Amino acid sequence: MSRPDWDEYFLGIATAAAQRSDCERSKVGAVVVKDRRVRGTGYNGAPAGAAGCSTCPRRLSGAVPGVSDYSSGATRCVAVHAEANALLYCDREDLIGATLYVTREPCYACSNLIAASGIERVVYPKES
């Protein structure tokens, strides 16, 4: 039996974090790691205190996950991405020179946040 390398290990933690998401379209997890220690985790979902996927207007309108336009009107998705949540719950000191592990390739907006955060390296599965 072989042990996973550090990247595999922390991607596994990101995968576990993704399971907390109640998004019916895509479950994404992220982990901030510095000096081989977890500094923060995040998963995609509605902001704290807001309606999650099961009660959001987008779902109640009959929008089909992965098919409907999620960018406007009653079907606008309010979810905060996993990467953003992980970054928001870290101290700035924890981000400088850290690695971000994500269960899929970050979107354009998250890539900009990551670039501005001080994260030095981003790891995600090749098949994402």
Swiss-Prot record:
One of its GO terms (biological process) is nucleotide biosynthetic process. It holds the Pfam family dCMP_cyt_deam_1. The active site is at 83 (proton donor). Keywords: Hydrolase, Metal-binding, Nucleotide biosynthesis, Zinc. It comes from the Viruses. GO terms for molecular function: dCMP deaminase activity; zinc ion binding. InterPro entries: APOBEC/CMP_deaminase_Zn-bd (IPR016192), CMP_dCMP_dom (IPR002125), Cytidine_deaminase-like (IPR016193), dCMP_deaminase (IPR016473), dCMP_deaminase-rel (IPR015517). Residues 5-128 form the CMP/dCMP-type deaminase domain. It catalyses: dCMP + H2O + H(+) = dUMP + NH4(+). Its EC number is 3.5.4.12. Zn(2+) binds at residues 81, 107, 110. PANTHER family: DEOXYCYTIDYLATE DEAMINASE, DEOXYCYTIDYLATE DEAMINASE-RELATED. Belongs to the cytidine and deoxycytidylate deaminase family. This is Deoxycytidylate deaminase. It comes from Mycobacterium phage D29. The gene is 36.1.
